[in-house]
């Protein structure tokens, strides 16, 4: 209950909706008869306050009634205003080297750029060290449909077919293309989710890796000496309904690292400012920056940027205990699952990829 006091009197309101969430699952427990409060649960409660528009509220008191007490421990309960982020004013984007190149024209000539891919050439695969599952990759233009519209000419369509896990995979291997492997790297791509983007499981998106064909993907846990990876990830879209985030897809990082506790990577979502929550049919500028840790020290840096705004930053990663592990490749990987496969075809679109040795940022306008 919420007890609201105004100059007109006192009202006791019942909740319009409530749910608690547990970190162990993306599911919400909105259909439960009670709410739970503990260290791993967040409770959300909504009260209808439209009737008080224009009135001065003297006080508002939240009343919670305890039904059960497990373990006898006391809890400090914090009460906050929930803000999903979509209504926050956007901060100005942070620019990088791309700001000097409207529509990325001429950016390939910049001395810090190692690769620029705009997918205008049917032989686009020649610029990459490895192309896997090429049958899932196709160049498309404005006639595509499916919510697609051109960013800057043609784009690369990636398909995950019904009953399949694989999208496509492009690999830029630093050793093959530049002669050495760095400890720090940047890459940026543009991403649009098609209207048919309805995955039934989370999966993988482009990122960095140093698996060396040994460990760091597919349940091959790492130990600090044999490999690592920091690919992107996506989660199942928010269910349709009375929710401003309905249909949106959260993205983040999927990381195999030396402190991992299971055989599979850990997920960190890019949720700062709600920047890593994507809607279908819109182009986003996605940039990742990695600086590998000092061997044996938890000081590795991983950053994610969306449309030039910092969406994620973590500074305590430990990927390696030996200096022989470096940034082996940019892995433009799209994969559904896990092991679950979608019941229908899914499509996303990629354009204007830049791999560089410094911050790239959004394309110039």
Model-predicted regions and their roles:
Residues 59, 74-76, 301:
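Exposed beta-strand and adjacent loop surfaces of beta-rich binding modules
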Residues 1-4, 60, 79, 187, ...:
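Generic low-polarity alpha-helical segments
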Residues 88-365:
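Low-complexity, Ser/Thr/Pro/Gly-rich disordered linker/stalk regions
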């Amino acid at each position: 209950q919420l007890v609201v006091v105004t100059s007109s009197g006192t009202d006791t309101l019942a909740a319009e909706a409530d749910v608690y969430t547990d970190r162990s699952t993306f599911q919400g427990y909105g259909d439960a008869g009670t709410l739970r409060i503990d260290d791993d649960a967040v409770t959300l409660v909504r009260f209808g306050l439209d009737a008080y528009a224009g009135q001065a509220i003297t006080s508002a008191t939240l009343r919670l009634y305890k039904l059960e007490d497990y373990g006898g421990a006391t809890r400090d309960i914090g009460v906050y205003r929930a803000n999903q982020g979509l209504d926050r004013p956007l901060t100005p984007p942070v620019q990088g080297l791309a700001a000097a190149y409207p529509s990325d024209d001429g950016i390939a000539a910049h001395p810090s750029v190692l690769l620029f891919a705009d997918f205008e050439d049917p032989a686009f695969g020649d610029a990459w060290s490895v192309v896997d599952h090429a049958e899932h990759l196709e160049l498309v233009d404005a006639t595509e449909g499916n919510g697609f519209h051109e960013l800057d000419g043609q784009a690369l369509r990636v398909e995950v077919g019904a009953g399949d896990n694989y999208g496509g995979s492009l690999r830029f291997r630093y050793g093959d293309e530049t002669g050495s492997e760095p400890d720090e790297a940047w890459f940026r791509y543009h991403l649009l989710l098609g209207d048919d983007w309805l995955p039934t499981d989370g999966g993988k998106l482009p990122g960095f890796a140093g698996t060396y064909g040994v460990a760091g993907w597919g349940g091959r846990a790492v130990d600090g000496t044999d490999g690592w990876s920091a690919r992107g990830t996506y989660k199942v879209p928010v269910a349709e309904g009375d929710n401003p985030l309905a249909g949106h897809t959260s993205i983040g990082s999927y990381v195999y690292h030396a402190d991992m506790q299971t055989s599979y990577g850990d997920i960190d979502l890019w949720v700062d400012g709600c920047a890593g929550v994507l809607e279908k049919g819109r182009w986003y500028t996605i940039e990742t920056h990695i600086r590998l840790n000092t061997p044996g020290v938890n000081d590795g840096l991983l950053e994610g940027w969306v449309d030039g705004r910092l969406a994620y930053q973590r500074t305590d990663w430990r990927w390696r205990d030996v200096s022989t592990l470096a940034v082996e490749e940019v892995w433009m990987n799209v994969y559904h699952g896990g092991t679950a496969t979608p019941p229908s075809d899914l499509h996303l679109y990629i354009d204007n990829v830049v791999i560089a040795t410094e911050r790239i940022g959004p394309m110039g306008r």
